[in-house]
């Protein structure tokens, strides 16, 4: 069961930005994200009411949970949505994998946690991987949108790292992650709703099969079920081993991007994904199991 949950999270989150690309822009990205966050918030609230887990947050924890929700679910998601539409899912997935380097850096800055040298070495390989993949786009003068997408993806990844700091602080306070997610998605959905209302957008729900199926995938599978399985994985095998899947996100996203015809199969894509995966694995402290070594 543990292996199935691991593979589920790996594939689902690796295809996250592919789903965003398929969903498209029949309505604004802000409105699409609002739908996703509102539905997910209701699902987690229902789960809280059903399970009533221990580890309730106190009043002093609320600001940190708000930062977690705003950074991880609202602003970072919005940035990554825009980046996916402007560039490609493969590029965004690759850039997002830099989270395994940016999060330890943020933890060092804000929570004074020790920064292992392997994070820096893995970070260099990760940056090299990103540079290799985006080189063809940067060498073309007609790819301003791609450049914007790359910069926005970097901003979204930085925001995620900041949100991870708040999440780490909440974990130290023994707050149950289900409470954090329920409140975080609620705060994120409220912020996005305010943005949509401020923009004066007409609230409509596209009825195309591609939009609805992508929305259901992003809410029920990628935001709700995957998070539940991930929390169970952390409980069973620890956060470090659970985090190894991030190292494979670029491969999943890259392969899917090629299969749907979004990105051409090129040496830049292969080398970029390979370098990023190796860098992420090093940063996470991945080790070859003893059984494999003996073989």
Residue ranges, per PLM feature:
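Glycine-/small-residue-enriched transmembrane alpha-helix faces in small-molecule transporters
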Residues: 1-31, 143-169, 188-191
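Juxtamembrane helix-entry segments on the extracytoplasmic side of multipass membrane proteins
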Residues: 1-2, 26-30, 34, 57-63, ...
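Specific transmembrane alpha-helical segments of multi-pass solute transporters/efflux pumps
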Residues: 12, 16-17, 45-96, 132, ...
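Hydrophobic/aromatic residues within transmembrane alpha-helices
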Residues: 23, 32, 36, 83, ...
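Transmembrane alpha-helices of multi-pass small-molecule transport proteins
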Residues: 26-75, 102-103, 159-166, 182-200, ...
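Helix-helix packing/entry segments at the starts of transmembrane helices
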Residues: 33-35, 91-98, 166-189, 219-259
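Hydrophobic transmembrane alpha-helices of multi-pass small-molecule transport proteins
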Residues: 44, 115-137, 192, 247, ...
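C-terminal transmembrane-helix exit sites in multi-pass transporters
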Residues: 46-52, 99-124, 251-270
